[in-house]
Amino acid sequence: HGNRKKIIKKIENAGIDIKCWGRGWPAGRINSDEMVRIFCQAKINLGLTNSSGTAFLKPFIRIFFQKNYDGKVRAQDPKRWLDNFKSFLSRKRKQLKGRNFEVPGCRGFLLTDSTDELKNYYEDGKEIIIFKDVKDLISKTKYYLEHEKEREQIAQAGYNRTIKEHTYEKRFEEIFKVIGLI
């Protein structure tokens, strides 16, 4: 996951105890029940959805090169470069992830990086906390570890917003309205 390990190392170097799960982490993968338990019990759930250091580089390289079926890299046909470049420019690197809804939906406190869309769903500072960079992430982590009552109020507000507006039932209702089924 790109530079996530570097970010985690900086957090550890700042004296913050942190544990990570998933592919490539010492704690390994966990099942969905365990994930929900962690979301509920963790003091801070960290969202690094946009931290991939290769989010720009790999797609850019693919404009000019591609892997063959045997894994060997070869140059793309120059006639395809313009279309590949247009595709590259049109893609969004920052995406709203399910995790942005799952954590608040479990009454978990979410400290996350931002996407253009995220502020349309949650109020920063009231329902979730958004960090700008690693320095801001570390500062906000230390702050909210020390301010339990405020952290719990934000987690509860995030939960209330999620249950009110961001359930699958609400999403399907919106979709059905758009396509004219209701």
What role is predicted for each listed range?
Residues 141, 175, 179:
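Hydrophobic "lid"/C-terminal helical patch
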Residues 122, 141, 155:
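Short, flexible helix/strand-to-coil boundary loops that buttress conserved ligand/catalytic motifs
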Residues 1-124:
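Nucleotide-sugar donor-binding catalytic core of glycosyltransferases
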Residues 134-150:
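C-terminal "capping" alpha-helix adjacent to the active site of nucleotide-linked donor transferases
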Residues 146-176:
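A charged, aromatic-enriched C-terminal amphipathic alpha-helix characteristic of glycosyltransferases
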